[in-house]
Amino acid sequence: METSQEPLVTQKKSKPSVWRSMSLFLVPLLLSNVLQSVGQLVGMMAVGRWLGVDAVAAVSSFFPLFFLLISFTIGIGSGSSILIGQAYGAKNEERLKAVVGTTLTFTFLLGVVLAVIGSIFTLDILRLMGTPENVIHVSANYARILFYAMPFMFLYFAYTTFLRGTGDSKTPFYTLIVSTVINIALLPVLILGMFGFPKLGIYGSAYATVISTIATFLVLMVYLRKRKHPLQFDKTVRRYLKMDKELLVLLLRLGVPASINMILVSLSEIAVISFVNHYGSNATAAYGVVNQVASYVQMPAVSLGIAVSIFAAQSIGANEFDRLKQVIRVGIWLNYIIGGVLIILIYVFSHQILSLFLTEQETLYIAHRLLMITLWSYLLFGNAQIISATMRASGTVLWPTVISIFAIWGVEVPVAFVLSHYTKLEILGVWVGYPAAFAVSLLLIYGYYQFVWKKKQITRLIQ
């Protein structure tokens, strides 16, 4: 393919090594994920310590539902990051702004639709999930607070995706610092009712999230305008708010399969938590806390998946296919180095970590067993994520999605159901489903990458 423009990143001869470039990009990205998890961790700790295990169970029951309803937007975001990366690599600022404008409008409208659906059907869905009756109404009301603010929260998430797509991982990190500080500062004020504010209990946690996110989005918009950033909300971006039909179709082609995958992942989590809920609120609380801890283990995988996708998209946009191969290799190595060290540390200090969230011995015991069974397998998850991210950056989204869906619904959910219902493992059988699914996913995704994708001719999507 002809390339008439130089890549935006830098001239080819002056580019640093992939190891250096990806590491420099990865540090703020990892710190962002750490900070985001710290914010969630502090929120969960505040709820658990101040309000008790039932409040933790209420929040834990809600998150699979929330993830289900935002899955489509996450998929669209992944599609927009591919297009942003390729446009940036091709040094095509007009198309860059077109992607921004089109994505913003579609994302906002989608947020409105999901806010309405979520607020109306929250209670019904939580009942289908088997949420314990002693927490279901609190969980539903907590959810509605976040749903009402969803359209505006989505705009903030979209802009952080755009920035990372251009190779800027620092600005999203700085804005996240602002958001986290505001959120943590508001938690005691709104939960306990301080400085004249009403005592909102568990709902104070939701309001703190909403206020901090929207405030940070406004700060980010002002910053981009003052810096005259290419992604600022200027006349060109506003012109494309009407949505470029060609780009929208391409965005949906890239984003819908990823969204379907996200939705089915969410449904699987709803299925899994329904298995867990069968064992009572202690098991539900343990599940929620271990998910928080596992989010730290997933950080290298998720961060590297984002980094590899962006670097791969920029390499494809600039027609630098030798660099693309290096991106894949470096991503896989970093996954095992960073993820391996983190997993070892969490295994060693597992009791101390879980005790930060939980005080009841039965819940601690359940959570510890879950952690021991599943933690190591996130290395396999990370490897599969990196290979999949590379293929998605080229526009190959269907088969990575099919493989992921099969691993979840053909392996994880059936294994969790059968082992928990028909063997002596009981609740331990639920946990075994995770490593089984991650192993199958890696084997299948690597097979497709090696024997099919590598034989394809790769061309950029943004012209």
Swiss-Prot record:
Coiled coil: none annotated. InterPro entries: MATE_fam, MdtK-like, Membrane_Transporter-Flippase. GO terms for biological process: monoatomic ion transport. Pfam families: MatE. It is a multi-pass membrane protein. Keywords: Antiport, Cell membrane, Ion transport, Membrane, Transmembrane, Transmembrane helix, Transport. The chain crosses the membrane at residues 24-44, 56-76, 106-126, 143-163, 177-197, 202-222, 256-276, 293-313, 330-350, 370-390, 397-417, 427-447. It is found in: Cell membrane. GO terms for cellular component: plasma membrane. GO terms for molecular function: antiporter activity; xenobiotic transmembrane transporter activity. Its main location: membrane. The keyword Ion transport applies. Belongs to the multi antimicrobial extrusion (MATE) (TC 2.A.66.1) family. This is Probable multidrug resistance protein YoeA. It comes from Bacillus subtilis (strain 168).
